[in-house]
Amino acid sequence: MSTPAVHIENLSFAFDTATFHFGDAEVRPGEVVVLLGPSGAGKSTLMRLLRGELDPLEGAVHVVGEPVKTRKKILVLDESKAGWVPQLDDLQPMLTARENIAHHLLRLEEEEREQRVDDLVRAMQLQGQDQLPVRALSGGKRQRVSIAKAMANQPPVLLMDESLAQLDLRTKTSILIDVKQMVRDAQIAAILVLHDPSDALMIADQLWVIKDGALVQKGKPEDIVKAPESHAIAGLFDHINVVASTADIPGPWRLDGEEKWLFAHELPALEGAELLDSYTTPSGSLRRIRWNGYDLLQK
């Protein structure tokens, strides 16, 4: 089995009165991990720990087997370890897209530098626009340049913290598809914070769900959708995880005056359910049960 590109071990961080416990996790080359969770959950804090901006309270982050050094120990973050794409680009507007990418490759011989830039221009679909000043490019193209720039030194890890949040759906989807392909081709690891769970399901090999400063569930997207560990996690995918069915059955279908939603993950295990009533319908028998405060229909 390949060495993890990223390995976090017993990772925690404290800030004022807030404490974050991220525990253990790893990302392998060729994988895309997406962080999901509500605002303020700790996604950006975890990204800053991965990048080396913050010192952990406990634990460590390793990139390709080597511990990540923090900004306090070195003046400049090591971009050969992790490429970083911020939400708002930090490109030089007067330089061309190509010059912005090449700026991080000044130590290479000219021929090698030009070949590397050509490869990144193709990977990010910037052909024909790489000679334009970035101030003349659209927001989507600028972010493509930012991704190419982040990958200029061929780091084993790409980090993107809501870098595509300002883009329209079509542009964002197109970029995510190209990022996924680049990750596979280059066999790097990518960790992204995305706002929309639909985007996460499209691109992620793994999902890490962050809530209240903790990594509460991680795994393949399809596994988390099928078996979320809490109502809050199920709610992230409510467009696909709510059981969309109704039945014209007499009786009270409200609890404390409010309608109750039923999530798919609640169906398989109904231990301790209380039988309230049973009905015979043309399509078969139904049982009305109470389980964990919910009134449910069960065939």
Predicted regions and their residues:
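Non-catalytic connector elements of ABC transporters
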Residues: 44, 250-299
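ABC ATPase NBD coupling module
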Residues: 67-83, 107, 224, 228
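Conserved ABC ATPase "signature" region
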Residues: 112-129, 180-181
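Conserved ABC ATPase signature
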Residues: 133-137, 141-143
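A short, proline-enriched helix->beta-strand linker immediately N-terminal to the Walker B motif
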Residues: 152-156
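Conserved ABC ATPase "signature" C-loop
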Residues: 212-213
